[in-house]
Amino acid sequence: MNTHPNIVHDHVGAQHTVPQVAQASANRRAFTSIETLKSNVSQSDALRKFSSPGPASILRNLRLGPLQRIAEVYVPFHLYRVDYDLGREHQARFFAIDAVEGSLDLFEFPAIPQQGELIQLETRNALPVTLNDDASQKLMREKALRLIFQQGFFKLRDANVTTTRIRIDLHRAYWLAFYGNDTARCRVLDATRGRIEGAKASALFESWLSA
């Protein structure tokens, strides 16, 4: 069974409870120091989520094989303060957008994350920042407007929205699940929200895995 050379995996099964380093490779990613939101999903919780029974699980096992391994990975995010006016009421909200492609759902904070909400760690499983500031700000504005409209605030004017980057080191954790011998495709669990993500999240991580 081959594992991706750049991922540190947790193998499924009682005999592999300690995270194992993937097969040695000359191009293994170096450790990097990051600050990340504390995960709300433990390794055992992630295993239960990925292994939950049901028709979809049966079909997936038939198509891909059984769950073999999981890996916790970290995605960099850019944090913005988004200001806008609704009538006479001023609103200020804090949204984070992934700094890889800007394709993941926005994550909203009630306020700027404080030091006690973040942990510092060293990991090989951190995606790089590839989204520049201009592209990040443009995508944030578009996504924030769309989200606000979806929440029923149709009278908001585009010109009333301003976005301000809050420069902090911020990552969020995700669990990836690999089935059978397939290391190119994965399922994704958001370790903050505790939910299984859809196709766009899988595509983001699969692109990183194949790079």
Where does each model-flagged region fall?
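Hydrophobic "anchor" residues
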Residues: 195-196
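Charged, low-complexity helical/coil segments in non-catalytic cytosolic or luminal regions
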Residues: 2-184, 201-211
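Short, acidic, Ser/Thr-enriched surface-loop or helix-capping motifs
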Residues: 190-191
